Amino acid sequence: MARSRGERTPAARRITSRNARFQQWQALLGNRNKRTRAGEFLVMGVRPISLAVEHGWPVRTLLYDGQRELSKWARELLRTVRTEQIAMAPDLLMELGEKNEAPPEVVAVVEMPADDLDRIPVREDFLGVLFDRPTSPGNIGSIIRSADALGAHGLIVAGHAADVYDPKSVRSSTGSLFSLPAVRVPSPGEVMDWVEARRAAGTPIVLVGTDEHGDCDVFDFDFTQPTLLLIGNETAGLSNAWRTLCDYTVSIPMAGSASSLNAANAATAILYEAVRQRISGRTATTP
């Protein structure tokens, strides 16, 4: 939230030791349960923090280096974002920054949104991605980044999975986490209730799974229709439950000796084909 003109910036607190507050923030880096209980996670970097603010994510606390001259961006951030501000010793910030070569200038403590499928907008041109039981938070972040870049409307992370708000996922998304709704859902049933409700409301979403023995090649499928693309676990692929629920399955033609693509790369390739079809107006033949 930006301050109104003339409103004074609250005096910042200082933390120079590994006190209880610091330990709470440190736990957000590596403890999923504590992130979930606290309902918050850490964000660092100019673009991710700027996008979090731009898209209205509540920033609970801004931690900044109290012993260096801050950049113009950091000064403006501290001036305009109305929240708790704490000056930190640089060695403490470095620990929160996962001990990179240099401490981050600013770390934001950001509130998690509710895991509500209604956060994902559904229109007649709907294009969404479901990632089934991913084990790599980096892959989650990479798919969020690709889905955002290619105009998808949201990501569903299904089943027992890595955490959307793991630091590796947040970092891999390069800020796209804050512009693309990403929702964690425990079971296929909850997703299908949402899909069926959208179908009943007039948006005939089709579920398209990925499989090396798909019904057709990705280039021959009609992605101009409302589509939820299902990407399987990095090792096991789609679960039997999701395979059964698919309306169609598609495969990516492979050359050379590679047998498959990384899950994030596969999602990106298929999303690109979907967008290409939609831009060109091409309608392929759905089996």
From Swiss-Prot:
Source domain of life: Bacteria
Effect ascribed to mutating residue 135 to V: Slightly increases catalytic activity
Subunit (UniProt): Homodimer.
EC number: 2.1.1.208
Binding residues for S-adenosyl-L-methionine: 210-211, 232, 252-254
GO terms of molecular function: RNA binding; rRNA (uridine-2'-O-)-methyltransferase activity
Lineage: Bacteria, Bacillati, Actinomycetota, Actinomycetes, Kitasatosporales
Native source organism of the sequence: Streptomyces viridochromogenes
The UniProt record lists the keyword Ribosomal protein: no
Full protein name: 23S rRNA (uridine(2479)-2'-O)-methyltransferase
